[in-house]
């Protein structure tokens, strides 16, 4: 099969008008992506694409497992503590970044982008999903997604102490706050340069929210909030 520069399936019988953007369309009654040149596009991608490592390995409390750790690759970060069931500050080492430097030496941003793009294409991967280095993917000319956070204007705060939410990685936002839409749009506009790239497939707003072990807990917590809370006003 022949593919265009965006990774779209270069078949003129399936081509639509070029829009300069990734869009959605139906072919044979089924939804599909179209790339900026109008060709059908199947996203065969992975999350967390980057050239500086896929994450850090915790050192705090595990020092005895390692030797000769180069402090240049050690940093303080927030990692998930399995025993405590929540995120906590810890020292961590980035072995991926260290190994990359050992094998390839110091490289410019452009060289890292070229390396990453060539590696992905060699593996048959044509797109970069959430948590990727968006600027690197754009430079590498790999279709990518942009990740932005919604506005955190206010959080659910139930009056009933028995309705305690399991907020293991983030608090639960009040999406009906009057400033929520305005502030979220401001957050999106902060990445407008990336979003306007022809290689941008689309935008994720927020990751998933903390799952609750008990069904309906979010709803009950919402109804237990003070009367002035925007969501309580909406659903009461």
Describe these PLM feature segments.
Residues 1-138, 153-194, 198-202:
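Active-site-adjacent substrate/metal-binding segments within catalytic domains
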Residues 135-140, 212-215:
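Substrate-binding cleft/loops of secretory-pathway carbohydrate-active enzymes
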Residues 207-211:
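Short, internal active-site loops enriched in acidic
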Residues 220-236:
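Active-site neighborhood of glycoside hydrolase catalytic domains
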């Amino acid at each position: 099969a022949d593919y265009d520069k965006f990774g779209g399936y270069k078949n003129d019988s399936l081509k639509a008008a070029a829009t300069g953007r990734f869009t959605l369309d139906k072919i044979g009654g089924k939804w599909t992506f179209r790339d900026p040149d109008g060709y059908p596009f199947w996203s065969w991608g992975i999350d967390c694409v980057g050239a500086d490592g896929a994450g850090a390995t915790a050192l705090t409390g595990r020092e005895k497992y390692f030797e000769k750790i180069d402090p240049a690759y050690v940093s303080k970060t927030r990692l998930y503590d399995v025993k405590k069931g929540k995120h906590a500050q810890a020292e961590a080492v980035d072995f991926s970044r260290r190994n990359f430097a050992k094998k390839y030496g110091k490289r410019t941003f452009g060289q890292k982008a070229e390396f990453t793009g060539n590696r992905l294409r060699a593996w048959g991967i044509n797109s970069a999903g959430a948590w990727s280095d968006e600027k690197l993917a754009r430079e590498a000319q790999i279709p990518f997604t942009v990740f932005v956070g919604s506005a955190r204007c206010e959080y659910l705060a139930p009056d009933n102490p028995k309705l305690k939410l399991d907020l293991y990685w983030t608090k639960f936002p009040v999406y009906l706050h009057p400033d929520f839409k305005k502030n979220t749009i401001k957050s999106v506009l902060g990445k407008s340069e990336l979003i306007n790239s022809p290689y941008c497939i689309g935008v994720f707003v927020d990751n998933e929210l903390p799952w609750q072990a008990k069904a309906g807990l979010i709803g009950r917590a919402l109804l237990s909030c003070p009367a002035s809370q925007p969501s309580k006003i909406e659903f009461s």
